[in-house]
Structure formats: structure tokens, C-alpha cells
């Protein structure tokens, strides 16, 4: 099996959609048109509503994975990503913040990374 390279990822599909979607969610937050936007209405309901939705979507991902249904998993993971982006916008956490954290972890074993969190 050939070694995986990050360069093999189609940059348009893998990296451009998240910034585009993030900007759209920021716009929905700013415009706050709760009658016309699901995202704006969810954010207007507050943090608990956003977190509840993330919990629901997380559970749906688990169920889809358990059912071994590829298309259902894709659908539910996309829903979860969308709602995580809503949370990020809600708390002003940028994609750059997440990128920096993942980059920091890239060459660190999971065991070492968890140990470093315990010290903080």
C-alpha cells in the first residue's frame, strides 16, 4: 500500500470549503435574520441550544458508524462538522486556531500529547 501524503488531498474539496463555510456562518451571525436562517436562529437561542445540537449530531454519527452505512456516516459527519463550525463562530474560535493546534500535534504521539495536557 502506498504511503499517504497530505499532498494527495484535493485542496479544493479538503481545505477551501471550511473557510467558505466559516465566513458564511459569520455572516449569518452578524445579520441575525432568525426568520430566514437556521444558523442565525440556532445561535440566537444561545450556547445551550448549540451544544444540544452538537450532542445530537455526535450521537447520530455514532449510530451511523455502528450501522456501517457509508452514506449515512458521510451525511452525519457533515452535519457534525457544520455544527462544530457554528460553535466555533459562536465563540470566535478561528480555523487558524484549530489549524495551529492540529499542526502542534502533528508530530507528537497521542500518548505524549495527553501527558502534556495533564501538566497544564
Model-inferred region functions:
Residues 1-77, 81-120:
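Flexible "arm" and connector segments at domain edges
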Amino acid at each position: 500500500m502506498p504511503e499517504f501524503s497530505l499532498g494527495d488531498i484535493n485542496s479544493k474539496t479538503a481545505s477551501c470549503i471550511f473557510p467558505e463555510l466559516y465566513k458564511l456562518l459569520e455572516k449569518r451571525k452578524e445579520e441575525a435574520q432568525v426568520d430566514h436562517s437556521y444558523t442565525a436562529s440556532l445561535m440566537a437561542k444561545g450556547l445551550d441550544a448549540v451544544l444540544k445540537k452538537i450532542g445530537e449530531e455526535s450521537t447520530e454519527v455514532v449510530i451511523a458508524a455502528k450501522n456501517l452505512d457509508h452514506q449515512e456516516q458521510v451525511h452525519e459527519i457533515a452535519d457534525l462538522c457544520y455544527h462544530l463550525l457554528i460553535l466555533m463562530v459562536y465563540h470566535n474560535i478561528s480555523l487558524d486556531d484549530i489549524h495551529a493546534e492540529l499542526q502542534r500535534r502533528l508530530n507528537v504521539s497521542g500518548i505524549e500529547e495527553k501527558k502534556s495536557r495533564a501538566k497544564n
